[in-house]
């Protein structure tokens, strides 16, 4: 891993100084804020290559301001092979080349703030891309220090360890011949699930979140955040037909046993130190389950 950036190495939570003007959450500005979602790829193309980009968004800030919006929520702009519209992230601290550069992002952030607009980013931390440096290392061997960053299990005769079906298609387990093991992916096989049971993974994520907040972003929309804690028994799911021949993993992954513990830790280590907004995507949550968040 020599020569790779800090994001790709285990690290403790970054105890950074609050930037000038940033304070611990003391207001409820977000309660009355009007949020406008931007899908960068189709919003505005600034250079004529047929793909929307960050500079295109910057060029339309005055227009967005006239709409009366307060917050711009950006769908993922991180580096990604784009197997799932950017929700498969290969580097949390880099911008997808289709959209521009980090300098372009910083200019967008600065110009938005000048106009009284806030920027909220998608936060995708249930899984990464299989092209992320962590996963490339994880699959090399069972003794690799990154092995436990993901959820690996052995089945019998190279078969999946249980009958869970992916929310996209097929089995939720992908066989990897290198170590004769399967890794879990609730979504595409290109999106291996992170192992939130591993405190090193959580430290990596909190450090990354702090890095973006130190840049001045105004919060996160947390993608499928209710899925980060899995039932560690990994029992078979009920076969209902919804996943074909496979079982339903939903009862063992949604609103899992440690999800609130993890989010409370995230709040202590990162979120409570900034005047920001957060929104959590919690698929299929009941009113009672939602209230716990």
Task: Give short role names for the model-derived ranges.
Residues 288-292:
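Catalytic cores of alpha/beta
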């Amino acid at each position: 891993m020599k020569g790779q950036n800090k994001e790709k190495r285990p690290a403790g939570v970054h105890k950074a100084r609050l930037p000038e003007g940033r304070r611990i959450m003391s207001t409820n500005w977000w309660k009355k804020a009007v949020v406008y979602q931007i899908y960068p790829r189709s919003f505005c193309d600034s250079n004529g290559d047929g793909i929307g980009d960050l500079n295109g968004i910057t060029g339309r800030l005055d227009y967005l301001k006239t709409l009366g919006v307060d917050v711009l929520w950006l769908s993922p702009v991180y580096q990604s092979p784009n197997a799932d519209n950017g929700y498969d992230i290969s580097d949390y601290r880099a911008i997808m080349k289709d959209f521009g550069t980090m300098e372009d992002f910083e200019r967008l952030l600065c110009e938005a703030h000048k106009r009284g607009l806030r920027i909220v980013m998608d936060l995708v931390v249930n899984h990464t891309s299989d092209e992320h440096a962590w996963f490339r290392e994880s699959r090399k061997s069972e003794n690799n220090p990154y092995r436990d960053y993901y959820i690996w299990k052995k089945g019998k005769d190279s078969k999946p360890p249980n009958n869970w079906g992916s929310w996209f298609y097929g089995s939720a387990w992908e066989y990897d011949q290198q170590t004769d093991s399967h890794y879990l992916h609730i979504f595409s096989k290109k999106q291996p699930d992170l192992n939130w049971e591993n405190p090193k993974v959580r430290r990596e994520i909190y450090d990354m979140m702090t890095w973006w907040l130190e840049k001045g972003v105004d919060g996160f929309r947390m993608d499928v955040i209710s899925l980060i804690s899995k039932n560690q028994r990994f029992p078979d799911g009920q076969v209902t037909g919804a996943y074909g021949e496979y079982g339903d993993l939903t009862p063992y992954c949604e609103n899992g046993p440690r999800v609130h513990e993890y989010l409370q830790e995230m709040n202590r280590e990162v979120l409570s130190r900034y005047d920001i907004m957060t929104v959590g995507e919690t698929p299929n949550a009941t009113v009672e389950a939602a209230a716990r968040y």
